[in-house]
Amino acid sequence: MIISAASDYRAAAEARLPPFLFHYIDGGAYAEHTLRRNVSDLADVALRQRVLRNMSDLRLSTELFGETLAMPVALAPVGLTGMYARRGEVQAARAAAARGIPFTLSTVSVCPIEEVAPAIERPMWFQLYVLKDRGFMRNALERAKAAGVTTLVFTVDMPTPGARYRDAHSGMSGPNASLRRMLQAVTHPRWAWDVGLLGKPHDLGNISAYRGSPTGLQDYIGWLGANFDPSIAWKDLEWIREFWTGPMVIKGILDPEDARDAVRFGADGIVVSNHGGRQLDGVLSSARALPAIADAVKGELKILADSGIRSGLDVVRMLALGADAVLLGRAFVYALAAAGQAGVENLLTLIEKEMRVAMTLTGTHSIADISADALSRVTRERADAISP
């Protein structure tokens, strides 16, 4: 298969993975309207082409939370990444480090913090959920500190799990799920050998280290479902802000007022995100929500964005809409599933090349130059029309 874009990696991942895993990463909540709009709304963002601007001094590097990034991209936290490639979190972290960008480890990773952090030379980020078991949260934060994690990404848009209908059809959940997953694995021998057999243990490493016993895929939904905390409020995060002295990013912001609350709370950054369309179907896409949030808090904290980003062109679009950097989720998992660390490295190379083309043809010499001026007049008017 010829690989020239993230969509090619998606096709390769679908061919290689058992359906329950492919559809788990590919699907969204309910009828998946927001999932689709994340991509289509971003694709509708028209840029303003400029010519004869002497673009010989193009620069993609940027500073974020005291780190130098080769480009304004970080790999997003994705649960169960280690089920998509053998010790997948380690491979993805190495790919990110090789391309000079951060990797964010999920709370529900297969590989624990202590396995991933020593595998790379640059600092790692860590994502944490708001859970009822505060002992687990404190334990995870202590272990993250000990492992040299620099930035905490705090996910707040999961007080309860989203309803993902596709999971029931694919075998991730629903009737006879275990049997269906086993049959799917048997019919995908390359994955079964490389990940199913050689990729063991299939464990949620960060959770089992706290519980003192293995926590496999079957426990994933049950343990998390019992521990999501619908009573959480900003005041409940105060002890975390006191405990964690490094940069803290609040992930899951879609409303300007919530963004202002994050500023008042003392967050160092936010992620404008609808969880990749996996939580509440029918909410705004990140691309539609971003301009109003940027108008409200730009300059008071760092604004990151995710959901729907599939190319370097999409990265430039998000920056023009008001983001300082982006998180890349599904796209890197497709590449990881298809070709491991090399696949993720190649995807990041493609994204960098696409960014260079977009910046050259919009006359933006550096990341700091990418602003609303890079948007077409039609796009700017549309963004103004949906601002609260």
Curated annotation (Swiss-Prot):
InterPro entries per the UniProt record, alphabetical: Aldolase_TIM, Alpha-hydoxy_acid_DH_FMN, FMN-dep_DH, FMN_HAD, FMN_hydac_DH_AS, LldD
UniProt: substrate binding residues: 24, 129, 164, 278
Keyword DNA damage among UniProt keywords: no
Ranges that cross the membrane: none
Cofactor(s) the protein requires to work: FMN
Enzyme Commission number: 1.1.-.-
Biological process annotations from GO: aerobic respiration; lactate metabolic process
Active site: 275 (proton acceptor)
Subcellular location, record wording: Cell inner membrane
UniProt binding sites for FMN: 106, 127, 155, 251, 306-330
Similarity comment text for this entry: Belongs to the FMN-dependent alpha-hydroxy acid dehydrogenase family.
HAMAP family named among the record's database cross-references: L_lact_dehydr
Protein name (record): L-lactate dehydrogenase
